Swiss-Prot record:
GO biological process: 'de novo' IMP biosynthetic process
Protein name: Phosphoribosylformylglycinamidine synthase subunit PurL
Disulfide bonds: none
Alphabetized SUPFAM superfamilies for the sequence: PurM C-terminal domain-like (SSF56042), PurM N-terminal domain-like (SSF55326)
Family according to the record: Belongs to the FGAMS family.
GO MF term set: ATP binding; magnesium ion binding; phosphoribosylformylglycinamidine synthase activity
Residue spans crossing the bilayer: none
Reactions performed catalytically: N(2)-formyl-N(1)-(5-phospho-beta-D-ribosyl)glycinamide + L-glutamine + ATP + H2O = 2-formamido-N(1)-(5-O-phospho-beta-D-ribosyl)acetamidine + L-glutamate + ADP + phosphate + H(+)
Main location: cytoplasm
Keyword hit for Membrane: no
PANTHER family: PHOSPHORIBOSYLFORMYLGLYCINAMIDINE SYNTHASE SUBUNIT PURL
Gene that encodes the chain: purL
Organism of provenance: Lactococcus lactis subsp. lactis (strain IL1403)
Quaternary data: Monomer. Part of the FGAM synthase complex composed of 1 PurL, 1 PurQ and 2 PurS subunits.
């Protein structure tokens, strides 16, 4: 049980600093918001979590304004639980990504599991039925025992929650780097489908309307979780287990079905709905009121509790999982109670909407908080941080590109070593623990460029992916940010989809350090540039700052989640070569792009040098490939990323045990170059003439570089290895390293 302090003790002890408030912020609350009154224990706690970076984006809000957020396809952009994009036929796709980084280091299983649960609630709070989960994971070197434990438990947590709730985990990515050793990244994306008429908002309006608490009971878990996620890790952070929530996927399944039933069958009495996520009850209710310009009066005696003698501070800040807030029209309370009772869930009226603009709490007959509602939400402070270019950036910009030399005799061995690099090696051992086909909508499961799910009742499908190569951002945040969006779009296009929009998780270091803030704001410039060029507005997202341990920051890692629309299921394309005799086409030119590459990291143990990126060529190449696919000319498609051409060819050959015979006018090293904007396609010989005509008309650089064979040998210039041996290395590397 938490012991309350008096307002005077709070001021004297400055305990608010431990909760994340600065002296200046505390004085602003006291002098400007409360007109000289000292905030009490509950009020101070509420401001501490609501003014955390995790809740109010006080350091990143000016950066987020750079993003393009509108477009004819966007029905709802940032500001609600998730973004909503039209896909025709009166249907929309709803998606968002969230981070659960700090909790997943302290308690990897529960941290990852509750990260999944939270983002799922964001989706069904919009009225959508969740149809897919994706994850983007970053870990330290896998030869470290602590890292292996975190990998094992994080993936088990994601699998455990998704598998139990019955939502397929269909895709994602995993990468390893020293910078994540003390600060892993666990970003989870959820995608849902909805009819336009069921789209909801998180709002509390209409004087006298009732505020309902529904779902699981409140405990003491996760108190100050939002504050915990808004500061650097230090020597004692691993012991902060009370800041980590505990999830129950079976409870969430009941809550999901109950909320969907309310929305679809009782939508006329529902005013608003929102997940109780970060900062729990105070965040959800104050945000709902602030968005509607309302006030709220809540009676905490009615809050369902699973622990005894909880005080208002604990009830308001608890981040217990599987809870939602509903605003219900006055006079219809019993309908809500009866519906949730059917699911054996609490549904309790805890207050009413007012028109006084205040957030007022009562407990045991006494007023325990009375503050302007906007001061908790819309009027939280915003900081314009100093940005300073790190010294390393000028060095990289001025330097020559990294150019390795690889002899004919060495190229095959280097290829084998690349196949076994943890970031490149198959993640099959991870994604096989996920149920990727529950709900029976999954057409393309993990292992291809994008996951693809059919849209029942239509001839359409959705392609979805997550992407980010943080090494590029370390060398050049602007180009790296642009590349992250472009690679996500390449994955969608290679699957036969038209990119629609993105969500993001902006994982960066401490924004109070000018060099770290520069990385954030510069990466946002690059993301915006690609989003505008590729017509993929930012419709939702999350910011996770202070990803530093003992002063050492992670690589800047803005994870991009993207969804695309495949208008006709016949255009669904996968990366694997289909049959011997098909021609292999390389779309895009290959240059000496090794800075930040897997090859550079493997050969010299570090990354350095200048990187290049031609966004105009990227767009032209993507448009061409999508046109070729929709014209029915392409048998398989795979984008080129880490490891370059050689890795892409191998991955395309693996699934069906085929070989390749490739002769291309590039150096041995360029087989592993990571020049952007490239694709590997396979086409049937009878489509060659039509394909090459389209290639010429599109002014795209592309050429037939070889053919698919049934020899079981991968032959690429001087590189030669059996497909079986390559598959064994590729699929065996990660399980061997995890032992």
């Amino acid at each position: 049980m938490t012991l309350e302090m008096s307002p005077e003790q709070i001021q004297e002890s400055k305990i608010y600093r431990e909760w994340g408030l600065t002296d200046e912020e505390y004085l602003k609350i006291k002098d400007e918001i409360l007109d000289g009154r000292l905030p009490n224990f509950t009020e101070t706690g509420m401001y501490a979590v609501m003014w955390s970076e995790h809740c109010c984006y006080k350091n990143s809000k000016p950066v987020l304004k750079k993003f393009p957020t509108t477009g004819p396809q966007v029905l709802m952009g940032p500001g609600e639980g998730a973004g909503v994009v039209d896909i025709g036929d009166d249907l929309a796709v709803v998606f968002k990504a969230e981070s659960h980084n700090h909790p997943s280091y302290v308690e990897p299983y529960e941290g990852a599991a509750t990260g999944s649960g939270g983002i799922i609630r964001d989706i069904f709070s919009m009225g959508a039925r969740p149809i897919a989960i994706l994850d983007s994971l970053r870990f330290g070197p896998i030869d470290n025992g602590k890292t292996r434990h975190i990998v094992d438990q994080v993936t088990a947590g994601i699998a455990g929650y998704g598998n139990c709730i019955g939502i397929p985990t269909v895709g994602g990515e995993v990468a390893f780097d020293e910078s994540y050793a003390g600060n892993p990244l666990v970003n989870v994306m959820c995608v849902g489908l909805i009819e336009h008429k069921h789209i909801q908002k998180g709002q509390a309006k209409g004087v006298g309307n009732s505020i309902f608490y529904v779902g699981a009971k409140t405990g003491r878990d996760g108190i100050h979780g939002a504050s915990f996620a808004s500061k650097e890790f230090g020597s004692g952070s691993e012991t902060q287990r009370s800041a980590v929530q505990v999830g129950d996927p079976f409870m969430e399944k009941l809550l999901l079905e109950a909320c969907i039933e309310v929305i679809q069958n009782h939508g006329d009495i529902l005013v608003g709905i929102q997940d109780m996520g970060a900062a729990g009850l105070v965040s959800s209710t104050s945000e709902m009121a602030s968005k509607a310009g309302s006030g709220l009066r809540l009676n905490l005696d009615n809050v369902p509790q699973r622990e005894t003698e909880m005080i208002p501070y604990e009830m308001m800040l608890s981040e217990s999982q599987e809870r939602m807030v509903l605003c219900v029209k006055k006079g219809h309370e019993q309908e809500i109670i009866d519906l949730f009772k059917k699911y054996d869930l609490d549904a309790v009226n805890i207050g009413q909407v007012t028109d006084d603009g205040f957030y007022t709490l009562y407990h045991k007959g006494e007023m325990v908080a009375h503050v302007p509602v906007d001061s908790l939400a819309e009027d939280a402070p915003t900081y314009y941080r100093e940005a300073k270019v790190p010294e390393r950036i000028q060095k990289f910009t001025d330097s020559e590109k990294y150019l390795p030399e690889i002899t004919d005799s060495a190229v095959s061995e280097i290829f084998k070593k690349l196949l076994a690099q943890p970031t490149i090696a198959s993640k099959k051992s991870i994604y096989e623990t996920y149920d990727s086909r529950v709900m029976t909508n999954t057409v393309v499961a993990p292992g291809s460029d994008s996951a693809v799910l059919r849209v029942r009742g239509t001839n359409k499908a959705l392609a979805m992916t997550t992407d980010c190569n943080a090494r590029y951002l370390y060398l050049d945040p602007e180009k790296g940010g642009a590349i992250a969006v472009a690679e996500a779009a390449r994955n969608i296009v290679a699957s036969g989809g038209k990119p629609l929009a993105i969500t993001d998780c902006l994982n960066f270091g401490n924004p109070e350090k000018p060099e770290q803030f520069w990385e954030l704001t510069t990466a946002a410039d690059g993301i915006s540039r690609s989003c505008l060029a590729l017509d993929t507005p930012v419709i939702s997202g999350n910011v996770s700052l202070y990803n530093e341990t003992n002063g050492s920051a992670i690589l800047p890692t803005p994870m991009i989640g993207m969804v695309g629309l495949i208008e006709n299921v016949k255009n669904i394309t996968t990366q694997e070569f289909k049959k011997a005799g098909d021609l292999i086409v390389l779309v895009g030119q290959t240059f000496d792009d090794f800075s930040g590459s897997e090859l550079q990291k493997m050969l010299i143990g570090e990354i350095s040098g200048r990187i290049d990126f031609d966004l105009e060529t990227e767009k032209i190449n993507q448009d061409f490939v999508l046109k070729a696919i929709t014209d029915g000319l392409v048998s398989s498609a795979h984008d080129l990323a880490e490891g370059g051409l050689a890795i892409a060819l191998a991955e395309s050959a693996f699934a069906n045990g085929l070989g390749v015979d490739v002769k291309v006018d590039i150096t041995n090293a360029q087989l592993f170059s990571e020049t952007q904007g490239r694709f590997i396609l396979s086409i049937s010989p009878e489509n060659q003439a039509t394909f090459e005509k389209l290639l010429t008309e599109s002014s795209v650089s592309g050429e037939v570089i070889g053919k698919v064979t049934d020899s079981g040998i991968l032959e690429m210039n001087e590189l030669s290895i059996s497909t079986d041996e390559a598959v064994s290395i590729y699929e065996g590397a990660l399980p061997a390293l995890m032992k």
